[in-house]
């Protein structure tokens, strides 16, 4: 298989599962962590390797692997790969072209890059995509029951770093505080997306494209991250998917469902410890951006705007140019502005053009 973004949290776990299942690695790609990909090359001996920055070529130790550079290089690498499975764990809209290329080459796409579905779900062949996250894996597992008719799909949120921060102090928080996730150890971007609830807006849109635009879709807070998803059926019964908070479960099913079902990749749940499970609504007072959930479900192509403005705001926030209130404000302004506009987005080029327009418009926003 091919692992794009092999040095990130998902990529590292995917390689662990590949080793366990005896799956050979044809190709790897990474962003800036050349030291780690050099170690991965030694262990997995891929035939092809892609890195983002040509300035890192001198430090790369490909050990005979063919080397590709940049986002176009990743596309070229996918073009040449014979593997049937591509795991796309690239962070951000940078992973969008790789998703398109993988599907064009008739590969099965294990998708951890949320931005692909958020920005271009209407253009992707969903039948070839397996989502790599705990919420959508939970929904998939629950929807295997073909007797009951689903009515609404519900995913859970931990609440992120600011779930207990006094409301009047949220706007002044910095990135260092936003990166203190209560339950998970993840990359910087997804951890901050969790604090802002952008991650859950992304996952709501992913649910829309993956499992049914006709169903009611919602989210709630479950602080322990043990309940990942719930499905309410037409008979008003509800079934929940519970599992330890460990990404190796959805990753293992994305790689090989049969092997994944025959052996455990996560620790068993201690059912006696579950007395603490409690569901809470997502408050728009605390999570201001959550008020756009219905707007996004009514016009899911606004996902391009959500993602582009989020990446612009994220960069400013991580660079300490703005506080958390400014971060939220940039995204709010972008969604309010583009909600009034009409766009078709009938091709990848049109998606990328709108993405660029939003970045240019909001990238120049002064300090907030």
UniProtKB/Swiss-Prot annotation:
Gene Ontology process terms (BP): isopentenyl diphosphate biosynthetic process, methylerythritol 4-phosphate pathway involved in terpenoid biosynthetic process
One matching Pfam family: DXPR_C
SS bonds (residue pairs): none
Cofactor annotation: Mg(2+); Mn(2+)
Binding site for NADPH: 7-10, 31-33, 113, 115, 187
EC number: 1.1.1.267
Binding sites annotated in the UniProt record for 1-deoxy-D-xylulose 5-phosphate: 114, 134-135, 158, 181, 194, 199-200, 203
Record's keyword annotation contains NADP: yes
Record's keyword annotation contains S-adenosyl-L-methionine: no
Keywords, alphabetical: Isoprene biosynthesis, Manganese, Metal-binding, NADP, Oxidoreductase
InterPro entries: DXP_reductoisomerase, DXP_reductoisomerase_C, DXP_reductoisomerase_N, DXPR_C, DXPR_C_sf, NAD(P)-bd_dom_sf
Top-rank taxon, per record: Bacteria
GO molecular function, one term: 1-deoxy-D-xylulose-5-phosphate reductoisomerase activity
SUPFAM superfamilies per the UniProt record, alphabetical: 1-deoxy-D-xylulose-5-phosphate reductoisomerase, C-terminal domain, Glyceraldehyde-3-phosphate dehydrogenase-like, C-terminal domain, NAD(P)-binding Rossmann-fold domains
Pathway: Isoprenoid biosynthesis; isopentenyl diphosphate biosynthesis via DXP pathway; isopentenyl diphosphate from 1-deoxy-D-xylulose 5-phosphate: step 1/6
Reaction catalysis annotation: 2-C-methyl-D-erythritol 4-phosphate + NADP(+) = 1-deoxy-D-xylulose 5-phosphate + NADPH + H(+)
Gene3D superfamilies noted in UniProt: 1.10.1740.10, NAD(P)-binding Rossmann-like Domain
Binding annotation for Mn(2+): 133, 135, 203
HAMAP family registered for this protein in UniProt: DXP_reductoisom
Similarity comment text for this entry: Belongs to the DXR family.
Protein's job: Catalyzes the NADPH-dependent rearrangement and reduction of 1-deoxy-D-xylulose-5-phosphate (DXP) to 2-C-methyl-D-erythritol 4-phosphate (MEP).
Protein's recorded name: 1-deoxy-D-xylulose 5-phosphate reductoisomerase
